Amino acid sequence: MTKSTGGDSKNTLYCSFCGKSQHEVRKLIAGPTVFICDECVELCMDIIREENKTTLVKSRDGVPSPRDICAVLDDYVIGQEHAKRVLSVAVHNHYKRLAHGAKHNDVELAKSNILLIGPTGSGKTLLAQTLARIIDVPFTMADATTLTEAGYVGEDVENIILKLLQAADYNVERAQRGIVYIDEVDKISRKSDNPSITRDVSGEGVQQALLKIMEGTVASVPPQGGRKHPQQEFLQVDTTNILFICGGAFAGLERIIAARGKGTSIGFGADVRAPDERRTGDILREVEPEDLLKFGLIPEFVGRLPVVATLHDLDENALIEILTKPKNALVKQYQRLFEMEDVKLGIHEEALRSIAVKAIQRKTGARGLRSIMESILLEPMFDLPGLQGVEEIVINKEVVEGRAKPLYIYSDRRSEVAPGA
């Protein structure tokens, strides 16, 4: 058991599970003959959540219900309630369609691929990754900006299927039920409204190439990747049942939507606010296929993405929740990292708010939180392995704003700023 740090050891209480003393934890809860600390309670809750996740209530076809999918998304993704509901229903219907595919031959159910529209750092990639984890299917990501048409320098679209196959450990059957997330699809928009007589190999050409695998084709994939050779053997992968989720920031799309809406609503029910007075996310919710066509996506590509979910910018409160609330929250990750050095990391509420403000100013959303945390904690992470007796490191608002250094609290209860400050 851990010994008490000061005071009469006879009067010191210890957690019956981890052995930490009352001085080392925030709260110690007493039972008839045992004690449990707040850290062990939190660990127990995590274990129970993990168990619940693996035993999701499934409908008769063996697919988790939309409500259960959404509940697990809530554990990892903060906010974006509308997008989570849209995705939960779409994913449930997709895998329910696969479960019933062989049973009902009278009505053919078409596949509904998904388009995610939202600013950088709003959670598009995380949503797609979490969905694949919930359904327990292979998952891969691709960057649309690196893709080119077959025969040109760059990455062939069929390489996406190869990556999915690798994620499935070359199990073709599993790969054919996987999820593919294609990021930055807004960057492959057509360069102008009029079809060009010259080849647009990284824009419209990529959209045309993606069409084939999105609507369903048998892709010939070289097992080792790379260029195809006539002599080598290929793996045949049917993409008909692969769920494609495309995502992008679509900067400027809100102006196209706002322009379409001008003059269409009059009278007492009209929304007379200027477009910039409304949140971008609210405007994006009104997106129509014609807006995506004007943005530069070709009609066939838009037609392959019938389900559209929009995400909004994250405000201060949402970013603070992202820092602290999810199971794998950034603050929890860094606290665990410091625990490995037997040091407690304390971050004040005002400091968290300042971190959120910085991320908003940088326009990086949740994606920028880690780089901010890294820069704040760089000195403590550099110093700690060579220091003795440090019990806690405190980060306050002044530290985040660069007006002060992190505070080091030692086991003899003395405090000092970071060495070398």
Swiss-Prot record:
Binding site for ATP: 119-126
Matches recorded under PROSITE patterns: CLPX_ZB (PS51902)
Source species, domain of life: Bacteria
Keywords carried by this UniProt record: ATP-binding, Chaperone, Metal-binding, Nucleotide-binding, Zinc
Keyword DNA-binding included in the entry's annotation: no
All residue ranges annotated as the ClpX-type ZB domain in the record: 3-56
GO biological process, one term: cell division
Chain sites annotated for binding Zn(2+): 15, 18, 37, 40
Molecular functions (GO terms): ATP binding; ATP hydrolysis activity; ATP-dependent protein folding chaperone; protein dimerization activity; unfolded protein binding; zinc ion binding
GO CC term, one of those recorded: HslUV protease complex
Its job: ATP-dependent specificity component of the Clp protease. It directs the protease to specific substrates. Can perform chaperone functions in the absence of ClpP.
HAMAP family found in the cross-reference section: ClpX
Subunit note: Component of the ClpX-ClpP complex. Forms a hexameric ring that, in the presence of ATP, binds to fourteen ClpP subunits assembled into a disk-like structure with a central cavity, resembling the structure of eukaryotic proteasomes.
Matching NCBIfam families: clpX (TIGR00382), PRK05342.1 (NF003745)
Family statement drawn from the similarity comment of this UniProt entry: Belongs to the ClpX chaperone family.
Name listed for the protein in its UniProt record: ATP-dependent Clp protease ATP-binding subunit ClpX
Protein species of origin: Rhodospirillum centenum (strain ATCC 51521 / SW)
Source organism phylogeny: Bacteria, Pseudomonadati, Pseudomonadota, Alphaproteobacteria, Rhodospirillales
